A protein has these predicted regions:
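Nucleotide/pyrophosphate-binding catalytic subdomain
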Residues: 1-217, 221-222, 229-244
């Protein structure tokens, strides 16, 4: 099975922005085990800006574009160093792929990306994809890595997209602010009420949130309906969004 796995900054790091080593080690071990079982893994990982914030001991995520790009350049190096080291311990070779929105929107560049990623999978490599925050601007950015994960999953014809989060799933309200919020175990369709319950942006170090994850699920569901593929989208320990499969 070809599986796309997306992980966000808040899942990879502590609140300080520093890497949560134990969690990342466990994640790399699980993905390595899935690969050892014969699955093809495409790993979409946020975290460049968040790790750069931690490494530079900044108080908060920068808001101006130039500083965000600079911090991303710092953090991406450390992020890939950690992944290369941890996956190497399980005898897996990783490859770094950095994309902008134009790489997915422009037909020739999209095809080049798809061909290259297919070749990496043929070679038994574990591709690690992130948005190229060092050069991305509002005009060329994908926007958030939940959307990027969905677009990559559709592009590589993944049979399953798993979106990892620091929240157990979709709730009727933000469980961190409302103790009475209830888990929604299954989402048969993305209604206006469901989208409203998702709220806004997630952590202070990331760009996503539950709304972005629902948008990602919608992209996969639309692709499954259009192409009649068995693309399924869901959330780790959370609600299942139904696609064609």
């Amino acid at each position: 099975m070809r599986i796309a796995v997306k992980v966000g900054t808040s899942t990879l790091t502590h609140a300080t922005g520093r890497l949560d080593i134990r969690r990342v080690e466990k994640l790399c071990k699980v993905l390595s085990d899935l690969k050892n079982a014969g699955n093809e893994i495409v790993f979409i990982s946020s975290g460049a800006i968040g790790m750069g914030v931690g490494k530079m001991s900044l108080r908060e995520r920068p808001t101006d574009m130039v500083t965000k790009q600079a911090v991303a350049a710092i953090g991406q190096c450390e992020l890939m160093y950690v992944y290369d080291k941890l996956f190497s311990e399980h005898n897996h070779v990783v490859a770094q792929i950095l994309l902008t929105g134009e790489d997915l929107r422009e037909e020739k560049r999209h095809q080049n990306f798809s061909n290259m990623l297919e070749r990496l999978l043929e070679l038994g490599v574990l591709p690690i994809v992130n948005e190229n925050d060092t050069v991305s601007t509002e005009e060329v950015a994908v926007g958030d890595n939940d959307t990027l994960g969905a677009l990559v999953a559709v592009s590589v014809k993944a049979e399953l997209l798993i979106v990892l989060s620091d929240i157990d799933g979709l709730y009727t309200a933000d469980p961190r602010a409302n103790p009475a919020a209830e888990l929604i175990p299954e989402v048969p369709e993305l209604t206006e009420a469901i989208l409203c319950s998702a709220g806004g942006k997630g952590s202070s170090l990331g760009t996503g949130g539950m709304a972005a994850k629902l948008t990602a699920a919608g992209i996969c569901m639309a692709a499954a309906d259009t192409a009649k593929k068995k693309t399924r989208a869901g959330m780790y320990r959370g609600p299942v969004a139904h696609g064609a499969g």
